[in-house]
Design a protein with these regions (language model features):
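Acidic/polar active-site rim loop that often engages polyanionic ligands
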Residues: 83-87
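Short histidine-centered catalytic/ligand-binding loop motif
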Residues: 88-95
Length: 198
C-alpha cells in the first residue's frame, strides 16, 4: 500500500481541472487519472506502516510555513511510462526552492519505512534511479516537475482534446495553506489526515 502527501488546488484551479476531467471522461471513458481527485503529488511511496508514515511526516512539517505557487502553463507527458504510454495532460507548477525542499524533507523522513523493489526499473535515467534507491520514488529532487494531472489519454498525439487543452493560456496563483495525507490503493485514495501550514 502506498502513502501519499498531496497539495489540493484552490477553487478556480480545481474548477478548471474538473472541467477537463469531465470532458475527457465524456469523450473517452476510463482513461488513467480521470477519476482521481485533483491534486499535486509531493510523495507517493510504498511504505511498511501507513500510520507510522503519517506520524513521521506530520511531525516533520509541523512548523512549516505556508507558501505561494504559480501555475502559468499546461503541458503533456508524452508516452508516460506511468500510464503505459498514455499522454498525460497536466498543469505545471512553477518550480521554486521551497516546494523542492518540502518534498525532500518529507521523503527523507520516510527512508527507513520505504519498501523498494529488489532491482530498480529506472537504470536508464541516473537521477531517477538514484532517487528511487534512496527514497523509493524516482521523482524526488530537481528532476521532479510539480504538477496537477488531469488525465492520461491512450490516444493519438494529435487528438482534438489534447490540442484543445494546450491552446488556452492560463495564470493561476494561490497560497498553499495545508498538506493532506492519503492511503493509496491502485486508483483509490483514502484520506488520512491533514496539517495546516503556519
Amino acid at each position: 500500500m502506498n502513502f501519499g502527501a498531496f497539495i489540493l488546488p484552490n477553487g478556480k484551479l480545481k474548477h478548471e481541472i474538473m472541467f477537463w476531467k469531465g470532458l475527457v471522461e465524456s469523450n473517452y471513458p476510463d482513461q488513467f487519472y480521470t477519476k482521481h481527485l485533483p491534486h499535486l503529488t509531493l510523495l507517493n511511496i510504498k511504505v511498511r506502516d501507513i500510520n507510522l508514515a503519517l506520524k513521521k511526516t506530520m511531525k516533520t512539517i509541523n512548523d512549516y510555513n505556508s507558501f505561494h505557487i504559480r501555475i502559468e502553463k499546461k503541458g503533456v507527458f508524452w508516452n508516460d511510462f506511468g500510464t503505459h504510454g498514455g499522454h498525460t495532460l497536466f498543469y505545471e507548477v512553477k518550480k521554486n526552492q521551497y516546494i523542492l525542499n518540502l518534498q525532500k524533507v518529507l521523503a527523507e523522513s520516510l527512508t527507513s519505512e520505504v519498501i523498494r523493489r529488489k532491482a530498480s526499473i529506472y537504470k536508464e535515467d541516473y537521477e531517477m534511479d538514484l532517487s528511487y534507491k534512496k527514497y523509493g520514488s524516482p521523482f524526488i529532487g530537481e528532476q521532479w516537475i510539480p504538477h496537477f494531472s488531469v488525465a492520461s489519454l491512450n490516444k493519438q498525439k494529435n487528438n482534438p482534446v489534447i490540442i484543445k487543452f494546450l491552446e488556452k493560456s492560463i495564470n493561476f496563483r494561490f497560497d498553499v495553506m495545508k498538506i493532506t495525507f492519503w492511503k493509496i490503493k491502485k486508483n483509490n485514495h483514502f484520506f488520512l489526515d491533514s496539517i495546516d501550514l503556519r
